[in-house]
Each structure stands twice: as C-alpha cells, then as structure tokens.
Design a protein with these regions (language model features):
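Acidic, serine/threonine- and proline-rich low-complexity intrinsically disordered segments
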Residues: 1-44, 65-172
C-alpha cells in the first residue's frame, strides 16, 4: 500500500508542473482539505472530507471556486469551521492531487413520487458532476421503488377492483 501511494505521489510531482504551487503542495499533504465553494458568491465551502468551512471577509483570495485549505478551525458548538490559511486551487489541481478520492457511482432514489436515476462523480464529499441515467441498474431501481412504497404507502399503486376486493377480504 505504501509503495503504491509513494508511486502515485511521485507521478503527480514529476516535472515542473505544480511542484512549486502552494495549493498543490497543500492538496498533496491534505487531500481531504480540498474545498469547493457551495454556491456562487458564497463564502461557505465544502471540504472533500465533508466539513463545511467559511472564508472570512477580506481574505484576499478574490472569491475562488476552489481552495486548498492548510489550516481551519472550528469553535465548539458551530457547524462550520473557519479557514485560517488557504491557497487558491482549481478542479484540475484537485483531481490530480486527490485522485484517490475520486468516485463515480450510480444513484437511484425515490423523490416526490418519482424515481430519479443519475450518475454522480465526487471528490470525497464534493459533487463534481451529475448526469441523468436512462436505463439504471434493475437492482437499484427496485430498491428505490421499494423505499418509495415503504415511505408513501401502497396507495400509490393502481389496484384493479378485484385486487382491491381481495385486499379488503384479507384485511378483515
């Protein structure tokens, strides 16, 4: 395992590209601290490790979409931490430095009475992209429908009169 990790790190720093970039160095040291802005114009970021952090006003980073967070603190009782030290990054850097955190999964969910199927690419807790799936895995589809019926009830189904009569007799 250590040999694989050493080889991966060596590949990422070969050559001049990124070797002296502070964001790249921080991202290699702490890949779980790569952070993406949660909404346009927001000072709130989500780190790959799942922690939300806030960039203080006047930080001098010019409102970047991505940061490599070197130091963050969180006060007791607060849900978000504060960024104390960070370097401006981008998605390309994040993908290179934290390639082990990249995952692509198919998700099929029951949402408001409908089945939603999508392919989601993530860097840790950060969603990079979502694309609809036309033909989801039948097992995932079945599980989503079962969850939907369990939460919404059998009233969602259209029952023929004979089936309704049978259910009423069985309920007796």
């Amino acid at each position: 395992r250590w040999r694989r990790e050493a080889e991966r790190l060596a590949r990422t720093v070969d050559g001049p590209d990124g070797a002296d970039d502070p964001a790249y160095i921080v991202a290699l040291a702490y890949p779980e601290r790569l952070a993406r802005r949660r909404a346009p114009g927001s000072a709130s970021y989500l780190m790959a490790g799942g922690t939300a952090v806030t960039l203080p006003p006047g930080s001098g980073t010019a409102d970047p979409e991505w940061l490599a967070v070197g130091v963050a603190t969180r006060d007791p009782g607060r849900s978000e931490g504060y960024i104390r030290l960070a370097a401006v990054a981008d998605e390309r850097l994040a993908r290179r430095a934290a390639s082990d955190l990249l995952t692509t999964t198919d998700e099929v969910e029951w949402v408001d009475g409908d089945v939603v199927a999508r392919r989601v690419e993530r860097l840790g807790a950060i969603t990079l992209s979502e694309k609809p799936i036309r033909d989801p895995d039948p097992d995932l589809l079945g599980a989503a429908v079962r969850r939907g019926l369990a939460s919404s009830g059998l009233g969602l189904l259209s029952w023929p009169a004979e089936a309704t009569a049978l259910r009423q007799r069985l309920d007796f």
